[in-house]
């Protein structure tokens, strides 16, 4: 949210998808749990109050009204500093929202009998803890906000640096935010 300098046009475009596609699909299939893989907010430093008001009244209230719950891990755009997850927009803006659980640290959750490892933005402060979590978390699925070497950040532009995909081979499925196009490995 807040893309293109808090553009109302972009916000309305996103909300059209949520209103016309996402929420109707969730309701039709009685889906009550959502996992967001980070970067809920576009900019790490600010969002304008008009867009923030609309996020609350048009998105968060819709979650609550329909008894839905969103598990939200932090992405790099959600944190103020690149080297820590401690100061983040999600906690500051939505920390009291009953419809959201925010994950600043790695954690395994269970949804309908499935253990899922959630891994927020990996930075210099939490790198060792994150690598240990990746290696030891007892879950077949990992959802993170990962910088992975050799993957397309956007179509045709490979990311140079980041973690090696080999580190995640023990998982049956790994899903990540951060990258702006769907990719298979």
Residue ranges of predicted features:
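N-terminal active-site segment of His-dependent metallophosphoesterases
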Residues: 1-57, 130-139
């Amino acid at each position: 949210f807040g893309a293109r300098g808090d553009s109302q046009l972009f916000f309305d475009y996103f909300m059209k998808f949520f209103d016309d596609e996402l929420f109707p699909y969730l309701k039709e299939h009685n889906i009550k749990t959502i996992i967001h893989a980070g970067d809920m907010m576009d900019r790490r430093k600010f969002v304008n109050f008009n867009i923030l008001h609309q996020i609350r009244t048009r998105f968060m209230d819709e979650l609550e009204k329909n008894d839905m719950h969103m598990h939200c891990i932090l992405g790099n755009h959600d944190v103020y500093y690149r080297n820590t997850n401690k100061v983040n927009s999600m906690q500051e803006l939505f920390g009291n929202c009953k419809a959201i659980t925010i994950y600043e640290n790695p954690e395994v959750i269970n949804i309908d009998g499935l253990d899922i490892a959630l891994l927020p933005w990996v930075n210099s402060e939490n790198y060792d803890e994150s690598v240990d979590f990746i290696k030891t978390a007892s879950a077949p699925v990992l959802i993170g906000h990962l910088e992975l070497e050799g993957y397309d950040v956007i179509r045709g532009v490979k990311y140079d640096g980041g973690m090696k995909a080999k580190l995640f081979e023990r998982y049956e499925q790994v899903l990540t935010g951060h990258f702006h196009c769907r990719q298979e490995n």
